[in-house]
Amino acid sequence: MRALLALCLLLGWLRWGPAGAQQSGEYCHGWVDVQGNYHEGFQCPEDFDTLDATICCGSCALRYCCAAADARLEQGGCTNDRRELEHPGITAQPVYVPFLIVGSIFIAFIILGSVVAIYCCTCLRPKEPSQQPIRFSLRSYQTETLPMILTSTSPRAPSRQSSTATSSSSTGGSIRRFSFARAEPGCLVPSPPPPYTTSHSIHLAQPSGFLVSPQYFAYPLQQEPPLPGKSCPDFSSS
């Protein structure tokens, strides 16, 4: 068991030991020569170099590994690298550009959402029905009220006629009484007032639509003192 473990360690050192030593050198990047041929990059030292050839030397058009530090090639100043030829003039973008793009998109979404919300609130909201203004017309009110007044006053016509007939009969009776009183000598009785007729017009301020029936207006009688020694008959019993 121990012999098998020692054999594995030996094989690993033989496989990775020299390669690990070679990985300590510089890396020569790929380049394009004068004829336009591209050469792949390699790690110093290469398989055919000595172990101390860990520095990338030469020129931009021809690169190799060497051990002299003064012959070291500054690969950063070369412009014939393949990536420089494929993408000439490309510079690194600033770090804040992606954040600026994301922020602009976010602000655009906010503005668009606000516009859509305002449109939905103003245009898609159901409109309330407008109320018609109530217009009051005096003429229409009088037209509607006049039939009601006429119908309410029509049943009173017989009573007015009866009152007129009653007043006429009472007037006639009073005239007869006063005529009888005049026949007695020595009694002075004032003449009765003239009966009210329809020929006498009474001007009353009344609104249109109302009917005023003619009424009997009784005139008061002034009593005169009786003469001494004379008696007047009493007609109250009649």
Curated annotation (Swiss-Prot):
**Which membrane topology describes this protein?**
Single-pass type I membrane protein
Localization (cell): Endoplasmic reticulum membrane
**Regions of this protein lying in the Lumenal compartment:** 22-98
Q: State the source organism's domain of life.
A: Eukaryota
Membrane topology (Cytoplasmic):
120-238
List membrane-spanning regions.
Answer: 99-119
Q: Which residue ranges are recorded for the region named Disordered?
A: 151-173
Database matches in InterPro entries: Shisa, Shisa_N
Mind listing the UniProt keywords for this protein, alphabetically? Developmental protein, Endoplasmic reticulum, Membrane, Signal, Transmembrane, Transmembrane helix
Pfam family of the protein (one): Shisa_N
For this record, the Gene Ontology CC terms, alphabetical, are: endoplasmic reticulum membrane
What's one GO BP annotation on this UniProt entry?
Answer: negative regulation of canonical Wnt signaling pathway
The family line of this record is: Belongs to the shisa family.
Q: What does this protein do?
A: Plays an essential role in the maturation of presomitic mesoderm cells by individual attenuation of both FGF and WNT signaling.
Q: What is this protein called?
A: Protein shisa-3 homolog
**Native source organism of the sequence:** Homo sapiens
User: Source taxonomy lineage?
Assistant: Eukaryota, Metazoa, Chordata, Craniata, Vertebrata
